[in-house]
């Protein structure tokens, strides 16, 4: 059974490093936004084991017109659990939480090879693809949220 919980930023580092940035040090897996006011980190647990993580921070995106936006960063799921729907469960949980607090949009710099994953969750591409040196091709993706306010 999957369970989404708020976790500490420190709980994200091992999976960030292992899945997203194995060629970098743990220190390079720490983002400046991790401790920003309003930031939060979610984890999905399967039978008590942390299998998927993501971080969210208040951050505008110049290409978005929505006044209130959060950035998704460091989304990763352990290889052996990718068919469990942990990532989509986490994203849906975060979207609901953000919408309930009045956030109008959520966005990320998606790696090019996973843009279809986000599209299946209702996210849209924005702007042109770009390269992050040492990491690869990305595209900005976003979703407008239905706020309750």
Curated annotation (Swiss-Prot):
Protein name: Uncharacterized N-acetyltransferase YitI
E.C. numbers: 2.3.1.-
Domain N-acetyltransferase positions: 2-146
Example GO molecular function: N-acetyltransferase activity
Coiled coil: none
Naturally occurring in which organism (per UniProt): Bacillus subtilis (strain 168)
Highest taxon in the source lineage: Bacteria
UniProt cross-references to Pfam families, sorted A to Z: Acetyltransf_1
């Amino acid at each position: 059974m999957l369970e989404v919980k708020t976790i500490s930023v420190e709980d994200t580092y091992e999976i960030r490093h292992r899945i997203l940035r194995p060629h970098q040090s743990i220190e390079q897996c720490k983002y400046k936004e991790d401790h920003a006011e309003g930031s939060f980190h979610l984890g999905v647990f399967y039978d008590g084991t942390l299998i998927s993580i993501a971080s969210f921070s208040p951050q505008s995106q110049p290409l978005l017109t929505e006044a209130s936006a959060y950035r998704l960063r460091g989304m990763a799921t352990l290889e052996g659990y990718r068919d469990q729907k942990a990532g989509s469960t986490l994203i849906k949980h975060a979207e609901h939480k953000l919408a309930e607090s009045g956030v109008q949009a959520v966005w990320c710099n998606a790696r090019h090879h996973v843009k279809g994953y986000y599209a299946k969750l209702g996210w849209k591409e924005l702007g042109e693809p770009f390269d992050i040196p040492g990491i690869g091709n990305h595209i900005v993706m976003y979703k407008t949220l239905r706020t309750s306010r």
